[in-house]
């Protein structure tokens, strides 16, 4: 690529109609001449060849991805990761902002991903280390997406739960219970105060606990719990499956008593999520399997908040994500970023409920609330409810009691003096530390 060719892949914001472009932020490590490497990077993901031989034309003004800003962070002695490459020369770490014309792929998530994090992005000469840090969508692009059907307000209205977090619980043991056993445990947790009892992301439609039988038992238990507590409840059924089975599993689960559905968003694909969101009449909740495999490396892959944003775009009403606990191995800053992506303005797209989770209990509720910075989040203990020494009903009560302490502005230790379920969790934690 000569110097004139390189210029065709650079532009200023002022020279572009930015409503016609997605803006992407990347961390890149470039080998050799930086601007040549960046031009190749834009070319490979858009106009790899911008004219026909012997024809006086240039498709770059309309169709090329273009660098609109870049900053050289530092010169490196070697690449951050031993990625195989053939280029030679100095290595520079760069922050790069690229405008990509969305007419190249339209409002279609598979085509969008192919352009911004596909072959062209990760196989560009001179750019062996790549991390997609963010995507910014213009309102004209967002207008073609439906987004969450219910969102935060819709879910709160279903549950009549306002001014506080939404309390989920992952029924445990997560694998191995019969539908009858599973439903009894969920029922007890609803009586104790959970809003939503959910299948684990690994429990879907299996021979020993079919979605049909499990949903029937849980639907009956849910209605019984609603009658006894006077509170709406949700059974969240996992319908993750092959794409050609999703509609059938949806119908079976809802017909038999599930009133919200769990989907492992990346394993089934965001296009499948969008299809389900457009079809369903119950809230759709996403879980995070597969994302860490390409988001955890600091300088390579895709930053997790990009996937959170895309899950919201695809129509998830709730996004479950790695939370603040040490077990989740996620920096606090990254968790907060993901929470913000669920709720910040996004054109016509409704906010979705963020659920940062991982090894939570009544003892961590206050910490999660303070770090999230609002009540618009879901709290999703597993063993913190179902491993409670007094049983799942008491485990759920301990969560509600911890929230009462927060509302009263007093410590959970003080509140626990008159609330034995909360005291039992404190005592159990103290024993584990011995």
From Swiss-Prot:
An annotated Gene Ontology molecular function: ribulose-bisphosphate carboxylase activity
Domain of life: Bacteria
Keywords for the protein's UniProt record, in alphabetical order: Magnesium, Metal-binding
Binding site for Mg(2+): 198, 200-201
GO BP term, example: carbon fixation
Gene3D superfamilies (alphabetical): Ribulose bisphosphate carboxylase, large subunit, C-terminal domain, RuBisCO large subunit, N-terminal domain
Cofactor: Mg(2+)
One Pfam assignment: RuBisCO_large
Entries under InterPro entries matching the protein: RuBisCO (IPR033966), RuBisCO_lsu_C (IPR000685), RuBisCO_lsu_C_sf (IPR036376), RuBisCO_lsu_fd_N (IPR017443), RuBisCO_lsu_N_sf (IPR036422)
Free-text cofactor note: Binds 1 Mg(2+) ion per subunit.
PTM annotation (N6-carboxylysine): residues: 198
SUPFAM superfamilies in UniProt: RuBisCo, C-terminal domain, RuBisCO, large subunit, small (N-terminal) domain
Family note: Belongs to the RuBisCO large chain family. Type IV subfamily.
Purpose of the protein: May be involved in sulfur metabolism and oxidative stress response. Does not show RuBisCO activity.
Subunit structure: Homodimer.
Name of this protein: Ribulose bisphosphate carboxylase-like protein
Taxonomy of the source species: Bacteria, Pseudomonadati, Chlorobiota, Chlorobiia, Chlorobiales
